Amino acid sequence: MAQAARLSLRMQKELKLLLSDPPHGASFPHLSSAANGSGDFSTFSTIDAQIEGPEDTVYANGIFNLKIQIPERYPFQPPIVSFATPIYHPNIDNSGRICLDILNLPPKGAWQPSLNISTVLTSMRLLLSEPNPDDGLMCEVSREYKYNRQTFDYKAREMTEKYAKVKADGCSTSLQIKNHGDEKSGESGNSVKLKLTVESSLSIAHTVKRETAGRDEQEDGNGKRKAVVGFGEGNSFGNDGIKRSRKKLSLALPSQSQKKDLCGEEELTRGVSAACKENKKPNLNGKKLSLGLKQPCNDTLASFRTSAAKSDNNRLSRKLSLRSPLGELNEVSKPEVLAQTDMKLEMNQNEDARSLRGEFENSVLEETSMAESIVVLDSDDSGQEEEERVSSSRSRLSLAKRRVLKCRP
């Protein structure tokens, strides 16, 4: 009896406070009508409240109905609060139950007798603006809120638009919890329609993709067309009339590019390097080039040899024509003279060959003078050998002259 009296006094104070200084964004339509009719506040065991969705959230411009039940041991027990309007929230389930620490007793909750209904409604609006997905009632919604925020925002706005929007005449479209089953069935019907539209759009995209793929396969089957036309475009039209284009780039390697790696060696054997003309470094593969031409080019040496042989024949014919007075000599001295002339011709041929070889070496060195080419100079021994050959040839010439002078009468 004493507990009921204390509860009546407490409720009268709180309800008057709610009417005089309501929380921000909260209203009590039934409570205000009872106050105008001078009703008894002590008989209120259930309070119907309305809260507005916080601004800059997915629940903005929405009005949500709440049902507040006052227990007999209030304020030592927290009030029982539930949402009568469907809402998409991690901490509020489909039946309207709320997961909030202020609505539970310690040690799990944080309710205290010093708190009141105004504090509870303020905490509700704070929960709408800042959900707690780590302690949620709806696991799927909590997962969407954490990892797929865009999908969560879309669904929350859609449900707010459907159930919590205010009509033009000022009446709210939110329904009570008793009609929640019908609303759920209507929501499921809309979800089915949404799925059908999504599937139809996917099928259209799939058919368009298949058409473009078949067109690309036909173009790939014709090899000549792919080699000539390197950039193709396939256009297709969907059911919505939007033109979709798919561009394709095909690269064909020409046969001439496969022979570029061998251009250095082929041009080097011909005497002229194409890489030098294009200011490129030839790929010599570490081969050494010596002044003695240890690895001469076959074509160039053959040409020089033929030219040297022709010049030697011409010189031999000229010398023989000039040596015609030797016929007046004795028959015994003719073989000696011929031997001497043969020796001189051999020496001249050697000197001509050396001069031609030096000219060829100089030309090759001028063409292949690069940073990567390695020139190996002949040692001093080769120079000494050349000097010995020259001295020996000179001594032979002097001996031949002496013999000729002796043979003359």
Swiss-Prot record:
Region entry Disordered, spans: 207-232, 373-395
Record: active site: 99
Keywords attached to this entry: ATP-binding, Nucleotide-binding, Transferase, Ubl conjugation pathway
UBC core domain residues: 6-165
Disulfide bond entries: none
One Pfam family hit: UQ_con
Family statement: Belongs to the ubiquitin-conjugating enzyme family.
The name this protein goes by in its record: Probable ubiquitin-conjugating enzyme E2 37
Species name: Arabidopsis thaliana
